Regions:
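Short beta-strand scaffold positions
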Residues: 133-134
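Short, flexible loop segments at boundaries between secondary-structure elements
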Residues: 155-175
Length: 175
């Protein structure tokens, strides 16, 4: 079974910078497990990267080592022409708006992109299972609620990345 791990901006913000223990704990766990965190291009932009760059890292990204070492990877552009991806992203935006009692237009673009990326990697067969690591509970709930409605039952897992999660993280979380 192939598992893809998708992370949001909040994971890196919650870690602090590269000199912080939580960041190093995440780095160590991923490297020991031999896996990477995939981030949508929208998340890369939120982290300060230049989306027009030909290679990563770029811009003022505060986590260049993660990209250079290969444990943070920027995902390919979302395929908005794929009806599943665009539908799931629209549904995710509505779901998050309802969960947070906000207008759809005020939802950060990176949140639906997380769910869209999960749908895309499952739909293309790139992964059999997706683990979404996020500090955004509504986005995680959107993924766990919506993707099964599109034929991906038992193929998405939401992990809330709390401070405690990061402090106790080991490679076994990624195996």
């Amino acid at each position: 079974m192939t598992t893809v791990y998708i992370a949001d901006t909040g994971v890196f913000v919650r870690c602090g910078g590269p000199d912080k223990d939580k960041f190093q704990q995440l780095r160590r766990a991923l490297r020991q497990a031999g896996v990477s965190l995939r981030i949508p291009q929208r998340v890369y932009e939120e982290l300060g990267g230049d989306p027009a760059a030909d290679e990563y890292p770029s811009g003022n990204i505060p986590y260049p080592d993660g990209f250079e070492e290969g444990w943070i990877v920027v995902a390919d552009e979302l395929d908005y022409a794929n009806p599943l991806v665009s539908t799931v992203m629209d549904e995710a935006r509505r779901f998050i708006a309802n969960e947070t009692d906000r207008d759809e237009d005020s939802i950060e673009k990176a949140d639906p992109a997380l769910v869209g990326l999960a749908a895309q990697v499952l739909d293309t067969g790139e992964a059999d299972h997706v683990v979404l690591l996020t500090t955004d509970k509504p986005a995680g709930k959107a993924a766990e609620t919506l993707l099964p409605k599109h034929g991906f039952s038992d193929r998405i897992e939401f992990r809330y990345v709390s401070v405690e999660y990061l402090e106790t993280l080991t490679a076994t979380e990624f195996r």
